[in-house]
Amino acid sequence: MQVFQRKEDSSWGNSMPTTNSNIQGSESFSLTKDMIMSTTQLPAMKHSGLQLQNQDSTSSQSTEEESGGGEVASFGEYKRYGCSIVNNNLSGYIENLGKPIENYTKSITTSSMVSQDSVFPAPTSGQISWSLQCAETSHFNGFLAPEYASTPTALPHLEMMGLVSSRVPLPHHIQENEPIFVNAKQYHAILRRRKHRAKLEAQNKLIKCRKPYLHESRHLHALKRARGSGGRFLNTKKLQESSNSLCSSQMANGQNFSMSPHGGGSGIGSSSISPSSNSNCINMFQNPQFRFSGYPSTHHASALMSGT
């Protein structure tokens, strides 16, 4: 560790010969280099503090030489005297040298204990740095700690401000005044049901409660019912209309063909189709097992009946 000594005799500055700025700069550079090599074993915080003090001392030396002062503030040669000697003008720097280093070490130790303070927060004081107060600002379980505040404050309705993700489970105890968020489809369905209930109440009609499936037969019947592409139940009237339109379109397409091999035979007329054959065609299309296999047989049968 580098040791600094102070010479109290005022004749020390007068006894040393004055040198030019080049020699003084080289001596200060060599001294700082030797000090850096000697203080490598010290912690990084002490090394940085000594470097700052050395830079301040060298800058003060250069200003005193330019102003032409009577006394020369310079470091002694390290090789000649064994240790650096500082003039009386730098006594203030030597006395206060330990205080900045101690303050710097305190700030380093407090910054290294940020993780402990976050778990067990210590009482705030004026010595805590500004960065530590900013490090405590975070969001924990619906509580937001604003900047420069010692205690976190609760902010309601964080979902409205977008601070909480959309997929949040509902709380166990829901208050009556708290809103429940739904999508657009559910919102319109709720409004539609409310309007219907208000209309029935205005007409003094009995509002029937919607009963769930309490019996197994209702569930089995729902499984047997035909469903569309979206999983909805298909109406029976729509099924009959679709089958009738399909049968009529197939019959209309069959009128364009002639059964004679030479092309001179009579075509299939609309009068040749009887109501019984039409009903048979509907029944054939309603049955999925004979939907494709039954069509050629009915077509040939109607053609033979019209030919005879």
From Swiss-Prot:
DNA-binding positions are: 211-236
Give the primary localization class: nucleus
Region of interest: Disordered: 1-26, 49-71, 251-273
Which stretches are transmembrane?
none
GO terms classed as biological process: abscisic acid-activated signaling pathway; blue light signaling pathway; embryo development ending in seed dormancy; negative regulation of DNA-templated transcription; response to water deprivation; seed development; somatic embryogenesis
Q: Which compartments is it annotated to reside in?
A: Nucleus
Q: Which Pfam families match?
A: CBFB_NFYA
| KW Transcription regulation (keyword) present | yes
Question: Polar residues bias: where?
Answer: 11-26
Motif position, Subunit association domain (SAD): 181-204
Residue stretches of biased makeup (Basic and acidic residues):
1-10
Q: Which GO terms describe its cellular component?
A: CCAAT-binding factor complex
**Lyase: present as a keyword of the record?**
no
Phenotype of null mutants: Altered response to blue light (BL) and abscisic acid (ABA).
What GO molecular function annotation could you give as one example from this UniProt entry? transcription cis-regulatory region binding
Keyword set for this entry? Abscisic acid signaling pathway, Activator, DNA-binding, Nucleus, Transcription, Transcription regulation
| Source organism, top-level taxon | Eukaryota
Tissue specificity remark: Expressed in the whole plant, except roots. Present in etiolated seedlings.
Per the record, the similarity remark reads: Belongs to the NFYA/HAP2 subunit family.
Report the function annotation for this chain.
Stimulates the transcription of various genes by recognizing and binding to a CCAAT motif in promoters. Involved in the blue light (BL) and abscisic acid (ABA) signaling pathways.
Quaternary structure note:
Heterotrimeric transcription factor composed of three components, NF-YA, NF-YB and NF-YC. NF-YB and NF-YC must interact and dimerize for NF-YA association and DNA binding.
Query: What protein is this chain from?
Result: Nuclear transcription factor Y subunit A-5
Which organism encodes this protein? Arabidopsis thaliana (Mouse-ear cress)
At the highest ranks, the source species' classification is: Eukaryota, Viridiplantae, Streptophyta, Embryophyta, Tracheophyta
Q: Which gene encodes it?
A: NFYA5
